[in-house]
Amino acid sequence: MEYLSLLTGRPVPDRVESWRDASIDQIVAYIDGVKPAATPALDRRLHEAIQRFGVPVSAKEFATIERFHAAFVDAGLSLRFHSFGRPPQGYYPTYRELLLETDQKGRTRSYLASEGDFQFVRSLEGRDAVIPVVGDLSGTHALTAMGRWMTEHNERLSAFYVSNVENYLFRDDGFERYMENLNRLPHTDRSAIIRSIFGRFGLPDSVPGYYSTSTVQNLNELLANFSAGKYQTYSDLLGR
């Protein structure tokens, strides 16, 4: 409750500890029912929180952070993805919809679905275990550096979320280099690739009314099939 209130600029409720066992539906209803605080107060609180980290932040960087936070404050839980040069499409989910989404068994699965789920993700952040890596999946640096670090620390890949980037890699003739990069990552027989499939590439088992489908594939299976020449197009990869 406290996290989502601060993220959207809403006042944290009194006796916030009493919300510890609240459902995500109850938390969302609270956020939707209150107005955000005044912008100057939010900016002061944001600056104070960032300064406590002890990391030097320039005025330009503060302005960028304020702009990002303002998007969450202004739109609240109705915030949705925007791409450059065009308004959001009607099938883009809102933040509210993502928080309330359930799997096919009716279970909510966001990291805010329960206090335990949130604390697990929070503990990763607290240990600096969430590390952004910016790079080209078919390039020569990002995945190579990750593989080197994993080897040095005796780590093995559990899961790799690739979204729908493989579609673009096929278009740009980068899929083979991407396969080579994946093969360099230390992995096990249980390592998995998670992908999102959109629009016209939807699968027979896609849920009606949804624009995207998530699938899981064993990494060793992916690499073996590629070596056998089974993936010449993106549709081949999706099994269509």
Segments from the language model and where they lie:
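Extended, Lys/Glu/Leu-rich amphipathic alpha-helical scaffolds
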Residues: T188-V216
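Extracytoplasmic/secreted proteins, especially bacterial periplasmic and envelope-associated proteins
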Residues: Q26, A41, H141, A145, ...
